From Swiss-Prot:
Role played: Catalyzes the conversion of dihydroorotate to orotate with quinone as electron acceptor.
Subcellular location: Cell membrane
Keywords: Cell membrane, Flavoprotein, FMN, Membrane, Oxidoreductase, Pyrimidine biosynthesis
Pathway: Pyrimidine metabolism; UMP biosynthesis via de novo pathway; orotate from (S)-dihydroorotate (quinone route): step 1/1
Binding residue positions for FMN: 62-66, 86, 139, 172, 217, 245, 268, 297, 318-319
Subunit-structure text: Monomer.
Topology term for the membrane: Peripheral membrane protein
One record GO biological process: 'de novo' UMP biosynthetic process
GO molecular function: dihydroorotate dehydrogenase (quinone) activity
Reaction it catalyzes: (S)-dihydroorotate + a quinone = orotate + a quinol
Cofactor(s) this protein cannot do without: FMN
Name of the featured protein: Dihydroorotate dehydrogenase (quinone)
Length: 336
């Protein structure tokens, strides 16, 4: 009820202004009596995945807390894991505004943010100050002005800097809002990137005395053959996990709606069916050998259960959280 009232106010604002205001308020109120409005004590539903123990299988997807400013707030809401980022080596402002749109009737969101963030060094300082008990994922990407043929260098820079502080590292090669980025999902380009990442992982494991798993985040807009090839690359390179999926460029489910024609990636309920199908295809190809984190349209317990029945070991929420608030996490975890 309280969240519905707050949402009504936030939804009167431009979508990005509402997002920024929410982040400011979470930073301001966490640790004060006001955080009782969103702090939740949830039952333990422990899951072993990627060599880590998650207190429950419901996580916050990357993109909401790009700079790691509100880890404590999301931890207080009971998430089993929180994925911050996407972060790049250098700060960048992202694409021109407006770049975030709500499709309220479909409970969807279109964004073309473009990896706006304050840079990896800023994120690390925020992580070092935070106190939390959930698993922390850090999602890394490349700067827009880094040529795609040198993209691996950006991932390696970020990986080296976040490794010490991450529970796992998510490698984002599937955002539709950075030109050319999705080409890294295919063939030799993917294999070359994964080889470099695994080499760096081994080097950093020796340096820090701990193994931090790597998860690859993929797009929903892939053919069955492309998914099969990605799976072979994941297996061959011993990648620890796969996150399925990022946002979609397809507009079939929202055709004719206000903002449907806006460029960018579509998330939320319109993505649920396709992202779940990708999870199912991954499970078939990977045969349980590599864990799957299912994301895309998880806006209820039933949607989360669909992802898990399709083969997801963990699930993440983002758009569903925007529309339903912390109560969504509670509803999923309590019913598992």
């Amino acid at each position: 009820m309280l969240y519905r009232l707050a949402r009504a106010g936030f939804f009167q604002l431009d979508a990005e202004k509402a997002h920024d205001l929410a982040i400011q308020n979470f930073k301001r109120f966490t640790g004060t009596p006001i955080d009782l409005f969103y702090r939740q004590q949830l039952p333990n539903r422990p899951v072993e995945c990627m060599g880590l123990t998650f207190r429950n299988p419901v996580g916050l997807a990357a993109g909401l807390d790009k700079n790691g400013e509100c880890i404590e707030a999301f931890d207080a809401m009971g998430f089993g894991f929180v994925e911050i980022g996407t972060v790049t080596p250098r700060a960048q402002s992202g694409n021109d505004k407006p770049r975030l749109f709500r499709l309220v009737g479909a409970e969807g969101i279109i964004n073309r943010m473009g990896f706006n963030n304050l840079g990896v060094d800023n994120l690390i300082e925020n992580v070092k100050k935070a106190k939390y008990s959930c698993v922390l994922g850090i999602n890394i990407g490349k700067n827009k002005d880094t040529p795609i043929e040198k993209g691996a260098e950006d991932y390696l820079i970020c990986m080296e800097k976040v490794y010490e502080y991450a529970g796992y590292i998510a490698v984002n090669i599937s955002s539709p809002n950075t030109p050319g980025l999705r080409t890294l999902q295919y063939g030799e380009a993917l294999d070359e990137l994964l080889v470099e990442l695994k080499r760096k992982q081994a080097e950093l494991e020796e340096k820090h005395g701990k193994y931090v798993p790597l998860a690859l985040k993929i797009a929903p807009d892939l053919t069955d053959d492309e998914i099969s090839q990605i799976c072979q690359s994941l297996i061959n390179n011993k990648i620890d996990g796969v996150i399925a999926t990022n946002t979609t460029l397809d507009r079939t489910m929202v055709e004719g709606m206000k903002y449907a024609q806006e460029a960018g990636g579509l998330s939320g309920r319109p993505l649920q069916s396709r992202s779940t199908e990708v999870v199912r295809l991954l499970r078939k190809e990977l045969q349980g050998n590599i864990p799957i984190i299912g994301v895309g349209g998880v806006d209820s317990y039933v949607a989360a259960k669909e992802k898990m029945l399709a083969g997801a070991d963990l699930v993440q929420v983002y758009s569903g959280f925007i529309y339903h608030g912390p109560g969504l996490v509670r509803d999923i975890v309590k019913n598992l």
